[in-house]
Amino acid sequence: MESPRVEESYDKMSELKAFDDTKAGVKGLVDSGITKVPQIFVLPPKDRAKKCETHFVFPVIDLQGIDEDPIKHKEIVDKVRDASEKWGFFQVVNHGIPTSVLDRTLQGTRQFFEQDNEVKKQYYTRDTAKKVVYTSNLDLYKSSVPAASWRDTIFCYMAPNPPSLQEFPTPCGESLIDFSKDVKKLGFTLLELLSEGLGLDRSYLKDYMDCFHLFCSCNYYPPCPQPELTMGTIQHTDIGFVTILLQDDMGGLQVLHQNHWVDVPPTPGSLVVNIGDFLQLLSNDKYLSVEHRAISNNVGSRMSITCFFGESPYQSSKLYGPITELLSEDNPPKYRATTVKDHTSYLHNRGLDGTSALSRYKI
């Protein structure tokens, strides 16, 4: 059977605006009973999901006993280093965040997205100056983006100056605040392990940042009538130092490994960790910031919460380049230095276009 054809001519901007003006997001489209994916969500054939490879074993790292046994600690450092060099991704279990906190956070955010559209509309905005933003496709109007993504999102800036409880939608504020406190501790632990994996002092990466920044993206992926035509999130790399992802049991996250797309299994109680662009740059390609994506499905909705750790683009003008201690005659710098603000501005202006931004800093 032939794939549905994309119409050659249509007023894309008008359709984007009509979708945006509903303030109901993708969930609103699904609730209206659509049976076909609107044109603005249809990806070019080359960007659509292909068959996934299943023979790879995704790395899982047990953090149990990390601070109690020096031998166990070294084993964990070695596993983190190996996964960061070969995959740029790994799962962690026994990470210290109670399952009850994870479940409550997923339930609270899901409850918000599954409210009546009229209730949600009051929170819908594209004003990124706000600390909490509910919207669909923040890069909706970017010309470089091949198609809108099949998801709705709550963005929230959780550090250094987190929102008050009153700034959050009622169902999810308290759980997100509690979760962000726990995930911040885990993030610092991971930065310590990653520092040691590079042969640096444990506190090196944590101390390297002028102003720590934690940004959370709560993504709701409704069921899609034609999942083969669109994507929950198109392939991309992450901007910061480290990303920690909490996902429900629906699955859908895929990682590019050895030129194959690999499913990341939704293991109960686990969190997914991946290396960001800035850590690949700082490590001079020792650690990898790897392309990943979220595919759409036609049965059930998916909920995920992504936490981005890095330097604040608003409060630091520090130049970041490959770490001097890692360089040598045999390992010269592969990137020119840049600021987080410059990199963030570039990505925000470009949107998710399916390519890595690191190439613009290559020497």
From Swiss-Prot:
InterPro entries: DIOX_N (IPR026992), IPNS-like_FE2OG_OXY (IPR044861), IPNS-like_sf (IPR027443), Oxoglu/Fe-dep_dioxygenase_dom (IPR005123)
Positions contributing to Fe cation binding: H236, D238, H292
Keywords: Ethylene biosynthesis, Fruit ripening, Iron, Metal-binding, Oxidoreductase, Vitamin C
Residues in coiled coil: none
Residue intervals passing through the bilayer: none
One Pfam family linked to the record: 2OG-FeII_Oxy
Lineage top rank: taxon: Eukaryota
GO biological process, one term: coumarin biosynthetic process
RNA-binding listed as a keyword: no
Protein name: 1-aminocyclopropane-1-carboxylate oxidase homolog
Organism: Solanum lycopersicum
